[in-house]
């Protein structure tokens, strides 16, 4: 009878460890996409800043937009897919909604169709480049059924719409500042989500 109590306690501790691992994975489900797309937005802003100081040609900026976001989107989904796989292997919580396999395959399959059949999306994106990461965050949120990511996608989409009108008004530095603020906001959100994740539980040894 005495030997059964430590065994039962060890079982409960194991269940608690599994629960904590799943909570950590859920937090990373939020923090990883915000980190990836926040970094991509900031990199895009830096590229635009370098172009603005190097040339006054609007065609150069448009060329960057045509190339950057399709490639950056591919890098983003591949990075998230690899991250989710590493979390599943390390914490043993499985892929579940954190798996980006279908999203990655769908992105690469649909990208040529978008280029050929929905070219106006790219043209519109020239005037509101934040709409591209907003759409990708929305796709991730839909895949994971995650409310926080849906709110983040909506906020980025609103920023993209504002950027569209700022571009139409020919205010050169305002869209760049908006992208920097948006990217920084996503990174801050990622850091907050990561800090809220429980620390890795220590291994427990049953007393026999």
Predicted feature locations:
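Selected alpha-helical membrane-embedding segments in polytopic membrane proteins
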Residues: 27-112
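Membrane interfacial helix motifs at helix-loop boundaries and amphipathic/re-entrant anchors
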Residues: 46-68, 116-130, 161-180
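N-terminal juxtamembrane cytosolic/stromal segments of multi-pass membrane proteins
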Residues: 1-30
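Hydrophobic core of alpha-helical transmembrane segments in multi-pass integral membrane proteins
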Residues: 69-83, 106-119, 159-161, 180-195
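Intrinsically disordered, low-complexity segments enriched in small/polar residues
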Residues: 7, 90, 123-126
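Membrane-proximal helix-loop-helix units in multi-pass membrane proteins
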Residues: 98-99, 103-158
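Terminal transmembrane helical module of multi-pass membrane proteins
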Residues: 135-208
